[in-house]
Amino acid sequence: MNLIQRPRRLRISSGIRDLVRETELSPRDLVYPIFVVPGVHIKEEIPSMPGCFHYSVDQVALLAREIAERGIPAVEVFGLPEYKDEIGSSAWDMTSPVQRAIAAIKEAVPELIVIGDVCLCQYTSHGHCGELHGRYVDNDATLPHLVQTAVSQVRAGADIVAPSDMMDGRVAAIRSGLDAEGFVNTSIMSYAVKYASGYYGPFRDAADSVPSFGDRRQYQMDPANVREALKEAALDMDEGADIIMVKPALAYLDVVRQVYEATDRPISVYNVSAEYSMVKAAAANGWIDEQRIVLETLTSMKRAGAKIIISYHAMDAAAWLNV
């Protein structure tokens, strides 16, 4: 058979496959999310997210060192507060676990990039992402609270703030608020394209942020829409976002690619809790090769255009990649 083109020639050995590989996953692509809680000497596994834990602030310095040793450049900090109220005021309380954890991480590992999650759902008594007017989340009344939260996290030492609330205009408000406080070099990683997804279930258990009524479809995006994603990304860029996020990641790789092609900003994705937990459950039952599935999944996100991948698999993935 006279075949001039034989694509298998470039697959014939591991060395040649490595030589022509188009997408190379690295620990430097990853961000590890951590959950901090009130109390001391706490490291408790989250039941719906095997391998992920709640940490008290006194435990995060050791964790930060382990993360850095694996070559992961950044963490994103989420927290459960000591108290909740109607407006989520513990979100900007400098004595809350998130602010204290940020400070502890920066003291222990100054070179580790710390991202602060800016939202109110963990902090409000009703579990929604903003201040309520009746049963409606009041967009404009919420913005000052988000600004206060972002500023408090940066005062604690955060390098990047990541508004995940999906209120209109929050990037501009936060940018203005940070600049007014002199934090002109603090980056904003906007959850610009955040869908009202069923893939968040385990996270809401981990963060104790299930809404007490209704859902978040009034402010998070319809999973059926992609043109809206491009609009949201463009609006947040115009408002000053430095990094654009798509969340979730795996079911939205088509969206990731289109946003990547439409913008000159770095793209981040969030490999969310149910994506993680489904893999862990299948692996626990012996149905899949966990390492192979995880690395293939993360590579698909980078191949689609993501420069930054926030993933609960990050610690394991980094260990596998470093072998």
Language-model segments: residues:
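Alpha/beta enzyme core
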Residues: 2, 13, 25-31, 37-323
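N-terminal amphipathic/basic leader segments beginning at the initiator methionine
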Residues: 1-21
